[in-house]
Amino acid sequence: EDGIEYYADTCLPLIDAVSRKKIKFNALARHTYPGKRLTEDTKGLNSIGYWDANEPQDWGLDWHRNEGIEIHFLESGSMPYSQENQELELLPNNLTITRPWEVHKVGNPVIGMGKFYWIILDLDVRRPHQNWLWPDWIILAPTDLEKLTNILRQNEKVCWKADKRILDCFQKIGKAVDSDIEGSNASKIRLLVNNLLLLLLDLLVVEEVQLDEKLMNSSRSVQLF
């Protein structure tokens, strides 16, 4: 599909950097995403984790799409990042949101130094017009979840400035990933992901983002692909 691989095929540079001890990496994942294995208790979560680069790097993740919505968060350092037609330099506390059809790359061409977190949730969509199906362990009240879904579907702003609560949440996610043994932290991770989505809703509502319903219609899917 227009020559762009899904993430599963493009994470080889990361795996290689880890094997060369260039970078600290820890993740919980399923399918072909790298990391310790997630259990069925977090079904719908495809990857959650971080990397921490404390020396200059010689690799990057080329253009790719994810099988799910991805939230990135940079705790420290700086990170060249591109999404669709925008090139950015992410700074500490920057958060990015990538929908499954949005092509993006990390590094230009190499990644920066710093600590970088991500979470990928599979919502069973690959195109903008499809309805989002959240995992059944996402427990936001229906009105809140609908509000969050609509905001995420009807705007395409790439980068947000996160607050200390979001930083705290990602730091707790990092600790939960580190100490997980074969799914032992599944409940903790479920709660942290729910908390993150609630904090994200707060952030998006405060920012009063401009919504555009046209971003959800099927002609847009055709236009993109």
Say what each PLM segment does.
Residues 40-43, 66, 90, 111-113, ...:
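A generic fold-level signal
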Residues 47-144, 182-183:
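N-terminal regulatory/effector-sensing and dimerization cores
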Residues 63, 158, 213-217:
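Pocket-edge positions in alpha/beta enzyme catalytic cores
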Residues 100, 177-181, 200, 204-207:
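A general structural signal marking secondary-structure boundaries and capping sites
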